[in-house]
Amino acid sequence: MIVPGVVGYDDGAMRMTATRNPPGLAIAGEIDESTYPALVARLEELAGRDEIHLNLAGVEYCDLAGLRAMVLMAGAGRSSDSRRVVLHEVPPQLQTVLGIVGWDSTPGLVIDQRPSGRG
């Protein structure tokens, strides 16, 4: 269960904390094959929402599988309108990868560089 302000996952490599305003997750550390299952599990807990906010300011590394999991949440499982996934404070290297693979233009995905107010 996701509770705002409470660290929902921390294995020493990656930490995910639920945020209240905007509602979603603040993610820090490394997203790789060892932390990917935990990321997907937390994203699935948010799947019922129309808008999901992910603050990536603390992400030091993210592999393609991790990025793809976040991008696929935009509209995943929806038969009509896509949900919005808002990525806040995306590190420059992740912005570059999103652009190279073309995921930055995914319908329903918003890349917002303004501070999200992680609380």
Tell me what each language-model feature is.
Residues 1-65, 71-119:
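STAS-like cytosolic regulatory interaction modules
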